[in-house]
Amino acid sequence: MTDRLLVLVRHGQSEWNLKNLFTGWKDPGLTEKGVAEAIEAGKKLKAQGLVFDVAFTSVLTRAQTTLDLMLNELGQTGLPTSKNLALNERDYGDLSGLNKDDARKKWGEEQVHVWRRSYDVPPPGGESLKDTLARALPYYVQEILPCVLRGERTLVAAHGNSLRALIMVLEKLTPESILKRELGTGAPVIYRLNADSTVASKLDLAE
């Protein structure tokens, strides 16, 4: 029987997560806590008896480091890995690098909330969640999903918003539903798919 395994993991806490800054395509590393979260994610996957054939990640350090730390725990450091900006975090444009409280002072609480939580309103010079989906979804359909359907056990380490794009398709969620979905740092979600790419089972290791 083909094991159509897909595991999604948001990167561990980054230095800018800790400082409450908009990060987007900026490239801070992981905090000590973030490193520990990534190692713990690897241990959780190992405890599930999982072995992988292929991995995907973004071009940003925090996701790549998370993947490396997980693979080290799994004893799979040489795993074939594709790195692509399609899996990058949403680009926050002019908000990137700003403290979220400072942004609220500059543009107002309501406007910043709209930029952060609306589906299709981008911040100045940046991407909306809809824009992020527009680059992440084709990559999932063309590159990641075929691996899973071939029975290649697949691990994806990426970002809150690029993973929301994948989850939206996997779980057939509406834009309103996916906006409410919070993804914990370093928390693996294990999917097994049917041959028609629908979800056969889901296990959230954050729970």
From Swiss-Prot:
The EC number(s) attached to this protein equal 5.4.2.11
Question: Which keywords belong to this entry?
Answer: Gluconeogenesis, Glycolysis, Isomerase
Q: Which residues form the signal peptide?
A: none
Cite the SMART domains for this sequence. Answer: PGAM
Q: Which residues form a coiled coil?
A: none
PROSITE patterns xrefs: PG_MUTASE
Q: In which pathway does it act?
A: Carbohydrate degradation; glycolysis; pyruvate from D-glyceraldehyde 3-phosphate: step 3/5
Spell out the reaction equation it catalyses. Answer: (2R)-2-phosphoglycerate = (2R)-3-phosphoglycerate
Where is substrate annotated to bind?
Answer: 10-17, 23-24, 62, 89-92, 100, 116-117, 160-161
Among the record's GO biological process terms, what is one?
Answer: glycolytic process
> Which principal EC class is assigned to this enzyme?
isomerase
Kindly identify the residues recorded as the active site.
Answer: H11, E89
Any single GO molecular-function term of the entry would be: phosphoglycerate mutase activity
What Pfam families does its record include? His_Phos_1
Q: Where is this site: Transition state stabilizer?
A: H159
Q: In which family does this protein belong, per the annotation?
A: Belongs to the phosphoglycerate mutase family. BPG-dependent PGAM subfamily.
Listed NCBIfam families: pgm_1, PRK01295.1
Q: What PANTHER family does the record point to?
A: PHOSPHOGLYCERATE MUTASE
What does this protein do, in the record's words?
Answer: Catalyzes the interconversion of 2-phosphoglycerate and 3-phosphoglycerate.
Subunit text: Homodimer.
Designated name of the protein: 2,3-bisphosphoglycerate-dependent phosphoglycerate mutase
